[in-house]
């Protein structure tokens, strides 16, 4: 069934630019975009329905390409500790941080994890998100990682959004493997990943390359195991120190390397050559009160696509608004509003391997878009909060109206 969506303007995000169409018309056919362009150039046709968007601005549906939205408990107590001067690394060394969330997640039932995740994802979806990634990594044993990934699959079935699942079993060292990181990585590679892949629970594989997590050599073992299973990889890299994990990610044609505050010019060059997306996470930077900025100019010089994500997690970025991350990416990291919007649409789609179907308003792609009550696209990165979406459309069907 063809529908004609009219009386609007569009920022299509073709090629990562605004690519604005004034007085636009968008035609959908079933779940897909059939045509988009100026009203004056609309081809003749019959339409089952004509929808008046009342002068709204259209953008692609927003994509949150890095979240840890499934977890037990919360870490508001650690938030207080950090404000008193205790560092993230000190909290982790004392058994807090990821380890405390692992305990709570292992204890939670699948139904409890599902209910709590739905509650925290609802604000993101009402904010215009139509696709997102959710990582495991708070189970750190086969049963608990499988539990998390089953919840993620169920969220994909229940939510009006595309949900990609990423196995992050190499997130931290579980207590039962204390002092035996190599043994745990072996367990991840030979037992956890193959079992989860066999169950069809994994779309991609991630790891945390950092002094307080896993070394580049250990991460490479995970990447090799993922490659043998036919799974793409991504990496938490260069958040707290420089281990050149982003160069390692590029060597394995990773979908993305994320955080990147301590990446070097050499790392940026490698990522640009490999086509690996840089996922910027300003929420974690802000909450940890970091001072070292990702090298945005180096990423620009080497043509690295930059995505922006919420990093929704209980410890370092309890962020429930992707639009707030747009403002932070501009204000803290000095992205332009155009770069930031591309970062939560086309480049975020690339970071999830979804660019063929998501991320821009083009014929043949899914009709996932948002109608905003704004006067120009830069407002999406300008306003701090507020209910801007007028309508959220997924697969040409309205899923939210403001």
Swiss-Prot record:
Keywords assigned by UniProt, alphabetized: Cytoplasm, Histidine metabolism, Hydrolase, Iron, Metal-binding, Zinc
Enzyme Commission code(s) on record: 3.5.2.7
Residues engaged in binding N-formimidoyl-L-glutamate: 138, 313, 315
Subcellular location: Cytoplasm
CDD domains membership: Imidazolone-5PH
Entry-linked SUPFAM superfamilies: Composite domain of metallo-dependent hydrolases, Metallo-dependent hydrolases
Cofactor list: Zn(2+); Fe(3+)
Binding site for 4-imidazolone-5-propanoate: 75, 138, 171, 239, 316
Keyword Metal-binding: yes
Top-rank taxon, per record: Bacteria
Catalytic reaction annotation: 4-imidazolone-5-propanoate + H2O = N-formimidoyl-L-glutamate
Broad EC category: hydrolase
Pathway terms, separated by semicolons: Amino-acid degradation; L-histidine degradation into L-glutamate; N-formimidoyl-L-glutamate from L-histidine: step 3/3
A single GO cellular-component term on record: cytoplasm
GO biological process, one term: L-histidine catabolic process to glutamate and formate
Residues noted as binding Fe(3+) in the record, renumbered to the chain: 66, 68, 236, 311
Cofactor binding note: Binds 1 zinc or iron ion per subunit.
Stored NCBIfam families: hutI (TIGR01224)
Annotated family: Belongs to the metallo-dependent hydrolases superfamily. HutI family.
Function per UniProt: Catalyzes the hydrolytic cleavage of the carbon-nitrogen bond in imidazolone-5-propanoate to yield N-formimidoyl-L-glutamate. It is the third step in the universal histidine degradation pathway.
Protein name: Imidazolonepropionase
Gene that specifies this protein: hutI
């Amino acid at each position: 069934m063809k529908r004609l969506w009219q009386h609007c303007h569009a920022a299509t995000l073709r090629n990562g630019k605004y690519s604005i169409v004034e007085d636009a018309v968008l035609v959908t056919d079933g779940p897909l975009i059939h045509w988009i362009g100026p009203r004056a150039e609309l081809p003749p046709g019959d339409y089952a329905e004509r929808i008046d968007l009342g002068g709204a601005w259209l953008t692609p549906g927003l994509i949150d390409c890095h979240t840890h939205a499934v977890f037990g408990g919360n870490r508001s107590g650690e938030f207080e500790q950090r404000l008193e001067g205790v560092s993230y690394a000190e909290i982790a060394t004392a058994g807090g941080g990821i380890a405390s969330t692992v305990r709570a997640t292992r204890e939670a039932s699948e139904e409890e994890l599902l209910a709590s995740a739905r509650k925290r994802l609802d604000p993101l979806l009402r904010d215009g998100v139509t696709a997102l990634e959710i990582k495991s990594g708070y189970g750190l044993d086969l049963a608990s990682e499988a539990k998390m990934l089953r919840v993620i699959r169920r969220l994909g079935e229940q939510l009006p959004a595309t949900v990609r699942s990423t196995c992050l079993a190499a997130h931290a060292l579980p207590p039962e493997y204390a002092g035996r990181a190599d043994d745990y990585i072996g367990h991840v590679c030979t037992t956890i990943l193959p079992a989860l892949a066999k169950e069809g629970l994994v779309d991609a594989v991630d790891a945390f390359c950092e002094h307080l997590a896993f070394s580049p050599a250990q991460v490479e073992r995970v990447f090799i195991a993922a490659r043998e299973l036919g799974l793409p990889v991504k990496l938490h890299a260069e958040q707290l120190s420089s281990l050149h994990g982003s160069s390692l990610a590029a060597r394995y044609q990773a979908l993305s390397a994320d955080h990147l505050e301590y990446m070097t010019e050499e790392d940026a060059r490698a990522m640009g050559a490999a086509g690996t997306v840089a996922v910027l996470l300003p929420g974690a930077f802000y909450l940890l009160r970091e001072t070292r900025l990702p090298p945005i100019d180096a990423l620009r010089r080497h043509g690295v696509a930059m995505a922006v994500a919420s990093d929704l997690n209980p410890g370092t970025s309890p962020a429930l608004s992707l639009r707030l991350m747009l403002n932070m990416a501009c204000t803290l990291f000095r992205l332009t509003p155009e770069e930031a919007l591309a970062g939560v649409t086309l480049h975020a789609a690339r970071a999830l391997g979804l660019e063929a179907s998501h991320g821009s308003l083009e014929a043949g792609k899914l009709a996932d878009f948002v109608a905003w009550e704004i006067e120009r696209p830069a407002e999406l990165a300008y306003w701090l909060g507020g209910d801007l979406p007028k309508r959220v459309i997924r697969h040409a069907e309205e899923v939210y109206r403001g």
